[in-house]
């Protein structure tokens, strides 16, 4: 038994997760009635979601309170990359929809309890109100905009505190980080359970009716991950981006794919940034911010499904309208974390550009929920892995400029 344990400890986390995925698929196909097994995945995701707000608050307030005047954090470039990357993803989705026009079979049942925002202004109003949320409520509800804003305020206030107080804050951040390490080490079991749940509840053939839609959505996201993002990276760093891109996809995207939660993946991303050797002053702010506004995958989902609706209803669309759609999708996607239902519930905002009624747009949303098992997984994997990628290339570019 000890030999098996020692062998397990020596195996890398990624290989353990791979083993967990295989076992989860086999159990889902061969023993779908083991419903009690699903609780392990819920506990794993619940643990990550529970610790993530505390981790963000502790790290951000600690980093800002210890920050020396004039220290470089590269946040301006990172925020630009987040916004530009989201817009580029939206533009690629428009081009994909032109090359591979989709039509949808509607009359899909829709959850009537969901209420989409009435426009981009409402999305941003919601985000602004989250800035001034009660700090305790922000932590309890995982409102990362609120957590970030209060962590920054507390960090600035703590700059004038005694060294003993700052040391206490630093210790709290280290303790929280250690708890995160313990939870992440349970990823193979948690992901095995999540894979089992997906296979046992949905089967392997339930999505065959929507195969082309899934292919277009996933293909666009893969193109952005393996072509567009590396192109952005090479323009910034002037070096081969693929080792970093593939590492981000492997160590961040894989976990995000199965948890389907950018919030739950924040601790994973922070640990990866630490392993890469990035500055804590930077990634403690950029990673939770990225989980909120870096939404390339969401922009792809909004545009592909909106243009599928446009093709379904035979609505003509010119280049300028498509460009405007990309802007609206990018802006809306940045607010996806502030909307219940995420990117899918922002589709009516984009559909309104073409005069598509809310009732019809919500039927498109219904189609989105049907393919959501795969769409949401790929979307989260792209969004979350890009948070680390853009943080890393911004810091890399800074050091190259400094050496020049």
Swiss-Prot record:
Positions of transmembrane segments: 17-37, 39-59, 75-95, 138-158, 179-199, 212-232, 287-307, 313-333
GO molecular function list: neutral L-amino acid:sodium symporter activity
InterPro entries per record: Na-dicarboxylate_symporter (IPR001991), Na:dicarbo_symporter_sf (IPR036458), Ser_Thr_transp_SstT (IPR023025)
Membrane topology according to the record: Multi-pass membrane protein
Catalytic activity: L-serine(in) + Na(+)(in) = L-serine(out) + Na(+)(out); L-threonine(in) + Na(+)(in) = L-threonine(out) + Na(+)(out)
Highest taxon of the lineage: Bacteria
Keyword terms: Amino-acid transport, Cell membrane, Membrane, Symport, Transmembrane, Transmembrane helix, Transport
Cell location: Cell membrane
Pfam families (UniProt xref): SDF
A GO CC annotation given for this chain: plasma membrane
GO biological process: serine transport; threonine transport
Family matches, as PANTHER family: PROTON/GLUTAMATE-ASPARTATE SYMPORTER, SERINE_THREONINE TRANSPORTER SSTT
NCBIfam families registered for this protein in UniProt: PRK13628.1 (NF010151)
Family: Belongs to the dicarboxylate/amino acid:cation symporter (DAACS) (TC 2.A.23) family.
Its biological purpose: Involved in the import of serine and threonine into the cell, with the concomitant import of sodium (symport system).
Official protein name in the record: Serine/threonine transporter SstT
Gene: sstT
């Amino acid at each position: 038994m000890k030999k098996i344990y020692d062998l397990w400890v020596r195996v890398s986390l990624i290989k353990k997760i791979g083993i967990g995925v295989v076992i989860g698929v086999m159990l889902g196909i061969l023993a779908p009635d083991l419903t009690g097994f699903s609780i392990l995945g819920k506990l794993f995701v619940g643990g990550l979601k529970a610790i993530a707000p505390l981790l963000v608050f502790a790290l951000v307030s600690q980093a800002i309170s210890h920050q020396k005047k004039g220290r470089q954090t590269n946040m301006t470039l990172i925020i630009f990359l987040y916004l530009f990357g989201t817009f580029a993803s939206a533009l690629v989705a428009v081009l994909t929809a032109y090359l591979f026009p989709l039509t949808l079979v509607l009359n899909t049942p829709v959850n009537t309890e969901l209420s989409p925002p009435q426009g981009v202004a409402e999305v941003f109003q919601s985000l602004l109100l989250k800035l001034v949320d009660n700090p305790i409520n922000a932590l309890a509800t995982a409102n990362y905009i609120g957590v970030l804003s209060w962590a920054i305020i507390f960090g600035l206030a703590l700059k004038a505190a005694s060294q003993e107080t700052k040391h206490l804050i630093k210790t709290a951040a280290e303790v929280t980080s250690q708890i995160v390490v313990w939870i992440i080490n349970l990823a193979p079991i948690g992901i095995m359970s999540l894979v089992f749940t997906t296979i046992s509840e949905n089967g392997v053939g339930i999505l065959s009716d929507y195969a082309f839609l899934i292919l277009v959505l996933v293909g666009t996201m893969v193109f952005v991950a393996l072509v567009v993002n590396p192109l952005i990276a090479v323009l910034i760093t002037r070096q081969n981006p693929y080792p970093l891109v593939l590492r981000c996809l492997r160590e961040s995207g894989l976990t995000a794919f199965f948890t389907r939660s950018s919030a739950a993946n924040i601790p994973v991303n922070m640990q990866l940034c630490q392993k890469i050797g990035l500055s804590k002053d930077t990634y403690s702010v950029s990673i939770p911010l990225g989980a909120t506004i870096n939404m390339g995958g969401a922009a792809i989902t909004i545009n592909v499904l909106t243009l599928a609706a446009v093709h379904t209803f035979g609505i003509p669309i010119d280049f300028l309208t498509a460009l405007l759609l990309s802007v609206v999708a990018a802006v809306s996607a940045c607010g996806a974390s502030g909307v219940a239902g995420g990117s899918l519930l922002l589709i009516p905002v984009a559909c309104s550009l073409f005069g598509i009624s809310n009732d019809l747009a919500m039927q498109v949303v219904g189609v989105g929920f049907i393919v959501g098992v795969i769409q949401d997984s790929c979307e989260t994997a792209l969004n979350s892995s890009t948070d680390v990628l853009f943080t890393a290339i911004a810091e890399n570019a800074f050091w190259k400029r400094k050496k020049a």
